[in-house]
Amino acid sequence: MNAAPTVLLQQTQTLSAAVTQPIPGSRKIFVQGSRADLQVPMREIVLTRTPTLFGGQDNPPLSVYDTSGPYTDPQAAIDLAAGLAPLRADWIAERGDTLPLEALSSSFGRGREHDARLDAVRFPSRRLPRVARSGANVTQMHYARRGIITPEMEFVAIRENQRLEAVTDAVLRKQHPGEAFGAAIQQRITPEFVREEIARGRAILPNNINHPESEPMIIGRNFLTKINANIGNSAVSSGIAEEVEKLVWSIRWGGDTVMDLSTGKHIHETRDWIIRNSPVPIGTVPIYQALEKVDGRAEELTWEIFRDTLIEQAEQGVDYFTIHAGVLLRYVPLTARRVTGIVSRGGSILAKWCLAHHKENFLYTHFEDICEIMKAYDVAFSLGDGLRPGCIADANDAAQFGELETLGELTKLAWKHDVQTMIEGPGHVPMQLIKENMDKQLRECGEAPFYTLGPLTTDIAPGYDHITSAIGAAMIGWFGTAMLCYVTPKEHLGLPNRQDVRDGIMAYKIAAHAADLAKGHPGVQVRDNALSKARFEFRWDDQFHLGLDPEKAKEFHDETLPKDAHKLAHFCSMCGPHFCSMKITQDVRDYAAEHGISEDHALEAGMQEKSGEFVAQGAQVYRAS
């Protein structure tokens, strides 16, 4: 074991309180599965009693999906230098189809391991990776197609249901019918349904055997809509400690997966620290690191360098790879008349390689070789859209859709190897063209999960692209996209800071939830109903705690009404005490109850009383004060 020197250890010894304190008004709970070591974490929002004025009943706690891992659990001991507990290690080992390696398989990984100059940044706890036994396939899709329900599948089913069976209040269970556009939305998610969806290719459960710390989650249009957050250092910004904190910050606010897009120094070591401390799946774009290995000269990339990079990252524990195998030589000329050309970093790297060699993309020609690597570690494909439109003028053009058709072809090839696969999508698309993207993806790619960046619905709002894209994200999520890649306010302008990450995640949590409401996902309206009930009953703290960002809600409220007494007030600063619509509604109800009449009759009687007062006072519209 290599002991990291003091500087990095000091930086990572303690995360800031802002990223580790419990979510206000919530506590961590664990839902027991069928075996002792299967406990599914959730966040339980503790609610206060309804005031006597409104009936005086207790409000039971509400369970919600939680991505924050142990970082918001005051009972958990966090040691970044040791990493998280290997939750899935026993599940992986007991299947008997993997074995620990005696040494790293990647030549680059071995070189880093023996380079003493890296001791200052190396993750201190060394662990040898596992790999599939000779001839074995260790993907969740392979198990699913053999009829096996794994512990990971049961974990996912429990997690997706969010203890909906505990909600018995008819007011909270009320839900509008949804429009799911042909999706097979279930009233209750069972482990068998999870297995069926993975076997069919309509969902993926990204869980590399070398990332046993991860809490199983699922991506598919028949499940809750997920969001991804991007982190990563660059040549000009941020170090390892900052990236680990950014990871924890991202999952605190709801990042279901995190992509490490690092392009600066110490990519390998940064990724080690991130994966060992991540309870959510980690994705990467391996071509970025491969390019670093040839000093940024795309034309010098080779299959051998890329293959070694895939194995290096798979043995670290990366759960899904963005692979731009659909950028074909014949599609590159189709981008020549675009307004913004090729905007994907990965797409431009592969296009440059194709043109430099006048050969077909080596990721395409070696695709089945890549599948062999993926199924030996259970890494999922995220087939990259290297020709996505970079402005709305280029949306839905021949280059974009040509690549999508090729991704459909590659999906079927990946499924032949039982490799889990999702498809990446645009980009910049005006609202009227969004559904065409979703419909074509479902048709071409056999309903494999769609994973989209937005799309941004207009190009005129630099600094606000978390909003322009959340509009498109909500729409395409409703139409069937399974995971939404967040966009921050800094998109097109610079690298996001911590506040930008939070703003981007919040915009996308809203979009994902709005999509689930529109699809009619079972129980998804419970939280809305609970918050609305709390709002009507002036339970201010409950309103804050039921929101996606309790801290921001309380901060805004307290800007104008900061005292504790204001948390009991039957008004807010918007309307004040005399014009609160909800207070007036309650006054009508009280009048009706006092006089033993219906609310409609109460309104009529109240109008008659006011009419009499008006006439008695002289029937003057304006009176001297």
Swiss-Prot record:
EC identifiers of the protein: 4.1.99.17
GO CC annotation: cytosol
GO molecular function: 4 iron, 4 sulfur cluster binding; carbon-carbon lyase activity; zinc ion binding
Domain of life: Bacteria
InterPro entries: ThiC (IPR037509), ThiC-associated_dom (IPR025747), ThiC/Bza_core_dom (IPR038521), ThiC/BzaA/B (IPR002817)
Catalysed transformations (reactions): 5-amino-1-(5-phospho-beta-D-ribosyl)imidazole + S-adenosyl-L-methionine = 4-amino-2-methyl-5-(phosphooxymethyl)pyrimidine + CO + 5'-deoxyadenosine + formate + L-methionine + 3 H(+)
Positions that bind substrate: 230, 259, 288, 324, 344-346, 385-388, 424, 451
Pathways per UniProt: Cofactor biosynthesis; thiamine diphosphate biosynthesis
Binding site for Zn(2+): 428, 492
GO annotation (BP), single: thiamine biosynthetic process
Keywords recorded for this protein, A-Z: 4Fe-4S, Iron, Iron-sulfur, Lyase, Metal-binding, S-adenosyl-L-methionine, Thiamine biosynthesis, Zinc
Cofactor binding note: Binds 1 [4Fe-4S] cluster per subunit. The cluster is coordinated with 3 cysteines and an exchangeable S-adenosyl-L-methionine.
Cofactor: [4Fe-4S] cluster
Residues bound to [4Fe-4S] cluster: 572, 575, 580
PANTHER family, per database record: PHOSPHOMETHYLPYRIMIDINE SYNTHASE, CHLOROPLASTIC, THIAMINE BIOSYNTHESIS PROTEIN THIC
Subunit organization: Homodimer.
Family designation: Belongs to the ThiC family.
Function recorded in the entry: Catalyzes the synthesis of the hydroxymethylpyrimidine phosphate (HMP-P) moiety of thiamine from aminoimidazole ribotide (AIR) in a radical S-adenosyl-L-methionine (SAM)-dependent reaction.
Protein name: Phosphomethylpyrimidine synthase
Annotated organism of origin: Xanthomonas campestris pv. campestris (strain ATCC 33913 / DSM 3586 / NCPPB 528 / LMG 568 / P 25)
